[in-house]
Amino acid sequence: MNAIIEQARSLDGYQDSSELLQRRDQDWVLDRAGIEPRSLLDLGCGIGSLLLGAARRWPDLQRLWGIERSPLRLEQARAQLRGAGVEARLLEGDLLDLPPLAERFELISMTAVLHWLYPDEERLFRWAARHLEAQGVFLFTSHHPFAEDGLGGEDDLVAQALVEMGLAAPERVAALYAEAGLLPMGTRTRGREALRERVERHFRVDSIVSRPAALRVADSAEYQRFHAATFGTYFAPLVPATRLEECFVRLGRIAERRMQADGQVSEIPVSVWRCRAREGEA
């Protein structure tokens, strides 16, 4: 099996992927907390980078928890935190099917996860509101790529690859997604107003701060590893199995060309939301 396909199927290499996007936003997100929490729960904690950053920022943290669906990423998180001398309780769990916990937290965070919960984000919002201390803070990030014909963010690169591989004409790409039963990222990332409507059913939104997030890579190979670790085989239904490796190579070349032409692969607005539980929810 080709190494990049094996990586995509296992979602390995996230430690390198997070260096390109998530870690650079870590301080920006934690800056929005506005409190010095004694307890923190990170939802979709990945390899534990935000937990590690929080432990260093707030040395008086008494309870540090993380929940992650991927067993591989949980093991990597345990190793990273253990190596830094940080004690944390890490649980395996599906964010859309979490059991109730006895604990409540002063700070609950969730970064670079929301789009994977579509269209059931409210299940998580409801759960988070019920596990937040009365005066606690819920921080999460959302991405809002420009979406043409419903295709945005990573969809744009995938669409270009499909066209270059002769698998779809430009005007047929959206239809190809529909035929494959695959939701584009441009659909998974709700518009800010539509998202706010759902958030405000469970929280008071204190603030929303946004900035552009540019993806930059050194070369084609680095982009392929990023795509494999971040999206796995999500887009595989669009491509014949015998051409999946070719698709990764094509994506890498497109990313490299964009770097040469624009100095970046893509740019997507990202927002960090600071929320508090509504009365009766916490």
Q: Where are the regions that the model predicts?
A:
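Short catalytic micro-motifs in class I SAM-dependent methyltransferases
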Residues: 112-113
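Class I SAM-dependent methyltransferase Rossmann-like catalytic core
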Residues: 3-22
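C-terminal helical/coil "lid" or tail adjacent to the Rossmann-like core of SAM-dependent
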Residues: 3-4, 206-262
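A conserved beta-strand element that flanks and buttresses the S-adenosyl-L-methionine
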Residues: 109
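Conserved catalytic/acceptor-binding region of the Class I
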Residues: 139-214
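A short glycine-rich, Lys/Arg-flanked "PGG" loop and its adjoining helix->strand segment in the class I
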Residues: 122-134
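Conserved alpha-helix/loop element of class I SAM-dependent methyltransferases that forms part
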Residues: 20-37, 53
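Class I SAM-dependent methyltransferase SAM/SAH-binding core
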Residues: 41, 47-97
